[in-house]
Amino acid sequence: MSDLARLLDEVAGEFAPDPRTSVFEVAVEGDSLVGQTTEAEAVEALLALLTERGTTLRDEVVRLPDPMLAGRRCALVCSPYGAVHARPAMAATQVSQYVLGARLDVLTMRDGWLRVRGEDGYIGWMHPGYLEVGEEDWAREWETGSAGESLLSLDAALHDEAGRTIARLPWGARVIRDQPRSIRLPDGRRGALGAGELVPMARRADRFPARGDSVVRSAREWLGVPYLWGGVTQAGVDCSGLVQSILWMHGIALPRDADMQVRVGAPLAPVPGELLPGDLAFFAEQERVTHVALSMGEGLVIHSALANGEVAVDDLRGDRDVERRLASLLVSARRVLPD
């Protein structure tokens, strides 16, 4: 590795250590520093280090969000959920999803795709067919509910005047009621509640208190949902998506992946019988956290695992092979709910 390549790696490691939440794609071409980054300070630090070494380069690095996106730097998900991909291609791995009504920051465009950052800080590529794109004021109006009453979906469906379904709203989707019997979607479509339930955002804390028993009750509503890598809805969910989606409804914001979630909250001894309802249990393979489960108390956990193929309950003190293996991988626990 050349000295310059090593320097680029060092700066990336300091300022943008996790490509899931930051971008540092910078290289040297001729006498110019080119590429793009979300971390403006990283470029300044790199240029200073190069100057110390007697190297002067033209700074042509694009700071994200791309200035060329003026007026199109925000997006709202307007389909039931939108897939987030690792690369700008449908064949690329799905790394996450965002549900209808979620507000996203648009960082850049490539090959007709949008690189976005969600409310949880996660960065990935989304096809614009999932999204409505606009300005900051427009997105903030939606996000704050200033255009009407902000509502959260519990698997609701909207119908038109003829009773036909016009939208299926997954758990946690956000819509606006700006007329007595009319619900507005981010793309302007309207309908009336035809099935399921819509909970006012202002009543979320009452309906979904940050208590262990209430969190476990919510989690039970997900039993039997199929396992899906990158999923966050009851159409399919992975381990960290399950935990993130449930706790978000209870007012607890968590990062997207298990190895990120393990750094949140108060550390606990990873002893199955001592975990309370709502605590998080983390499991590792080859010394890396790869799985998270939600404690139900008394050694029981509810989780989405490929070994079960769905969201299921397992006993960390049980005798089944899958339960013994799971217990052997338990390495950490965290309490994210208030005492």
What are these regions (language model features)?
Residues R20-F24, E44-L69, R73, A89, ...:
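Boundary regions of SH3-family modules and the immediately adjacent low-complexity/disordered segments
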Residues A92, Y98, L169, E274-L275:
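Short, well-ordered loop/turn sites that connect or cap secondary structure elements
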